[in-house]
């Protein structure tokens, strides 16, 4: 399983939110480039970057910082937040980003997703951020009537490379991932699912590895690697692609 460290950018700084609340942003570092280098040095095979300002404003805001991050490390960078036009996605790819993550646009403008998947095959993912099973949009400030599972099925037919699923109630809480919701989502689609939100320990990652067989191929880790609850290098060795020990598949009895 791919263990993917997250960098959330707000005002050019590396922050973490609590349940998506911008008023509860905690600054962990004012040099996101150095943070990116640290995670790459510890064995990360991919970096997840969110432009929080962009998600709120509907356009890329931290493009300069993102460009510096992409130039500073040799691993693929995926970016989400405020990507609602072909031009905004093209800008990211022009500065070295490997994968773009669409969120609000997937709900409001699914034709854009289709167009981008055709233009950039294999490089478009959709982030489904759910609150009580319903898709949240516009930087999690609004909750739609769309079910997360329905959106995932629709996006899978439109050619997206992966679904990044975030349970907002778990995000930043260190309460563990929502295994039941992940299991349900992964079972409905054939494309990879990347889990996000609530991962707080190596045990949480092991529980997610047990879902690899049904398509959960990665886990985004945020607050826990900044607080030290998870040592990224150890996590990559324990559950990453080169791990020495297999984990038994989840038969549905794991507690979410």
Curated annotation (Swiss-Prot):
CDD domains: HisA. It is an enzyme of class 5 (isomerase). Its EC number is 5.3.1.16. Keywords: Amino-acid biosynthesis, Cytoplasm, Histidine biosynthesis, Isomerase. GO terms for molecular function: 1-(5-phosphoribosyl)-5-[(5-phosphoribosylamino)methylideneamino]imidazole-4-carboxamide isomerase activity. Transmembrane segments: none annotated. Gene3D superfamilies: Aldolase class I (3.20.20.70). Pfam families: His_biosynth. One of its GO terms (cellular component) is cytoplasm. The active site is at residues 8, 129. It comes from Picosynechococcus sp. (strain ATCC 27264 / PCC 7002 / PR-6). This is 1-(5-phosphoribosyl)-5-[(5-phosphoribosylamino)methylideneamino] imidazole-4-carboxamide isomerase. It is found in: Cytoplasm. The keyword Calcium does not apply.
């Amino acid at each position: 399983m791919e263990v993917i460290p997250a960098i959330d950018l707000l005002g050019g700084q590396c922050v973490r939110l609590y349940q998506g609340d911008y008023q509860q942003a905690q600054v962990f570092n004012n040099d996101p480039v150095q943070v990116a280098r640290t995670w790459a040095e510890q064995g990360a095979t991919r970096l997840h970057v969110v432009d929080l300002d962009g998600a709120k404003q509907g356009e890329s805001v931290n493009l300069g910082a993102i460009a510096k991050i992409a130039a500073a490390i040799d691993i693929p960078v995926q970016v989400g937040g405020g990507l609602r036009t072909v031009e905004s996605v093209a800008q990211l790819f022009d500065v070295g980003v490997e994968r773009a993550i669409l969120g609000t646009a997937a709900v409001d403008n699914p034709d854009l997703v289709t167009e981008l998947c055709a233009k950039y095959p294999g490089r478009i993912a959709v982030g489904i951020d759910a609150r009580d099973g319903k898709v949240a949009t516009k930087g999690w400030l609004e909750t739609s009537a769309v079910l997360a599972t329905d959106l995932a099925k629709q996006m899978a037919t439109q050619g997206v490379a992966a679904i990044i699923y975030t349970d907002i109630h778990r995000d930043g809480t260190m309460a563990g991932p929502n295994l039941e919701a992940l299991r349900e989502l992964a079972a409905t689609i054939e494309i990879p699912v990347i889990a996000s939100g609530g991962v707080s320990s190596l045990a949480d990652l092991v529980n997610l590895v047990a879902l690899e067989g049904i398509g959960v191929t990665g886990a985004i880790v945020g607050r826990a690697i900044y607080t030290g609850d998870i040592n990224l290098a150890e996590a990559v060795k324990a559950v990453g692609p080169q791990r020495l020990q297999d984990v038994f598949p989840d038969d549905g009895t794991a507690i979410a």
